[in-house]
């Protein structure tokens, strides 16, 4: 068992990036507002996005290159499109996840209630971990975080389920009001994660191969599938927590990070019992810390690679981009810290409406001449991919048409 865990890496980094805002904030809100009514959206998003995430490690294993190299081979304009989309979203995404993490740190540690101070502390901690240890430390840290998160979340769901007196209601709901539709799109945008994480996944796969040269293709794909299944299970768990504890409670979530965190944990402890405080607080904080550090690592890696491919060597530097991202995040944080909900909504909706681009680019690349034939997807995965592209494109067009 220990040997199996040691082989895991990029899949758990994927889980770490995926299970933050999409699970803790969006899945919990979905459960609180709709009960289990949006379970269909969670399952469909995970199903139809699966091939495009899978193509990340598959392409890297086939070619020894990242998907960004593949984008450049498809067309320089594909890579430039990625760069523009990434620059638009990465600061907002990093700020959104840091706000939630800082709010939860206030509840868990209680040293100071100043959310700006906690944001600075968290970003500084993440910077130190990444600049000192880079991939190796992040890889090892994530194994601990994911195990802790999974155990504490499953325990919290079990306690909530045994203490709940209401019957399980699984009627599925399709929102009709404009606000509810916007939430649905935001929910699906980051469920289980934005599709650009497939690029991060391909880079992490290459890093894992450097660290462990003997790791096989089968082990890498197994690692990815473990991470993916973990995100699905935990997504359902957080919907269950929101439904069992908060549904029909009469509470309205605040858009302020610290207040949201307080409401989240207090509602749990009031309903489940004060003894559950540590379980919920640890599960919530480790979820968001894992997302924060993973995002802070991945975006600079992709910027370095992208600018290298474009021939702009002077700014193709990991340390340069991680500092830019940290400073940009804290700057946005100071000006928008009272609008956590708005930031999360903007970040998640942007992720959804850009998903068709990543889906089409990844599908085209994995089936192109740039991928050896023996590594190209099976007919079944290709059928699922086409259905996924149709699903994501139709939903995006429909949403944009009703704005």
Language model: regions and residue ranges:
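Transmembrane-helix boundary/entry motifs in multi-pass membrane transporters
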Residues: 2, 35, 62-88, 108-115, ...
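Transmembrane alpha-helical segments of multi-pass small-molecule transport proteins
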Residues: 11, 83, 108-131, 147-158, ...
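Flexible loop linkers connecting adjacent transmembrane helices
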Residues: 27-29, 54-77, 105, 109, ...
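Extracellular loop-to-transmembrane helix junctions
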Residues: 29-54, 69-73, 77-80, 182
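Selective recognition of specific alpha-helical transmembrane segments in multi-pass small-molecule
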Residues: 42-55, 219-247
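Hydrophobic transmembrane alpha-helices that form the core helical bundles
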Residues: 62, 79-110, 288-306, 340-342, ...
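Membrane-interface loop-to-helix entry segments
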Residues: 130-162, 175-178, 347-355, 380-388
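Hydrophobic alpha-helical segments and their helix-loop junctions in multi-pass secondary transporters
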Residues: 147-174, 184-203, 359-371, 395-403
């Amino acid at each position: 068992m220990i040997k199996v865990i040691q082989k895991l890496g990029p899949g758990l980094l994927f889980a770490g990036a995926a299970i933050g805002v999409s699970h803790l904030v969006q899945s919990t809100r979905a459960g609180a507002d709709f009960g289990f009514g949006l379970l269909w959206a969670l399952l469909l998003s995970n199903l139809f996005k699966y091939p495009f995430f899978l193509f990340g490690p598959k392409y890297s294993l086939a070619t020894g290159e990242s998907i960004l190299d593949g984008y450049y081979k498809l067309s320089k304009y594909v890579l430039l499109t990625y760069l523009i989309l990434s620059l638009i979203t990465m600061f907002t995404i990093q700020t959104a996840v840091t706000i939630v993490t800082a709010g939860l740190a206030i509840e868990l540690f209680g040293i100071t209630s100043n959310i700006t101070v906690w944001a600075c502390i968290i970003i500084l901690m993440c910077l130190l971990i990444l600049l000192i240890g880079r991939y190796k430390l992040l890889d090892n840290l994530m194994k601990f975080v994911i195990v802790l998160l999974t155990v504490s979340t499953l325990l919290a769901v079990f306690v909530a389920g045994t203490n709940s007196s209401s019957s399980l209601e699984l009627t599925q709901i399709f929102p009709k009001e404009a606000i509810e539709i916007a939430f649905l799109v935001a929910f699906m945008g980051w469920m289980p994660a934005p599709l650009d994480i497939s690029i991060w996944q391909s880079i992490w796969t290459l890093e894992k191969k450097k660290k462990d040269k003997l790791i096989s293709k089968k082990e890498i794909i197994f690692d990815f599938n473990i991470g993916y299944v973990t995100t699905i299970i935990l997504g359902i768990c957080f919907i269950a927590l929101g439904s069992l504890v908060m549904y029909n409670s009469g509470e309205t979530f605040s858009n302020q990070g610290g207040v949201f965190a307080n409401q989240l944990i207090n509602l749990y402890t009031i309903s489940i019992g004060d003894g559950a405080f540590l379980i919920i607080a640890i599960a919530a904080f480790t979820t968001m810390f894992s997302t924060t550090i993973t995002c802070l690592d991945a975006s600079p890696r992709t910027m370095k690679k992208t600018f290298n491919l474009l021939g702009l060597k002077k700014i193709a530097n990991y340390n340069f981009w991680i500092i830019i991202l940290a400073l940009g995040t804290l700057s946005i944080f100071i000006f928008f810290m009272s609008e956590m909900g708005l930031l999360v909504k903007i970040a998640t909706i942007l992720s959804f409406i850009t998903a068709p681009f990543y889906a089409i680019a990844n599908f085209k690349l994995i089936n192109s001449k740039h991928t050896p034939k023996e590594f190209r997807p099976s007919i079944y995965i290709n059928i699922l991919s086409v259905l996924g592209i149709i699903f994501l494109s139709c939903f995006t067009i429909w949403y944009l048409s009703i704005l």
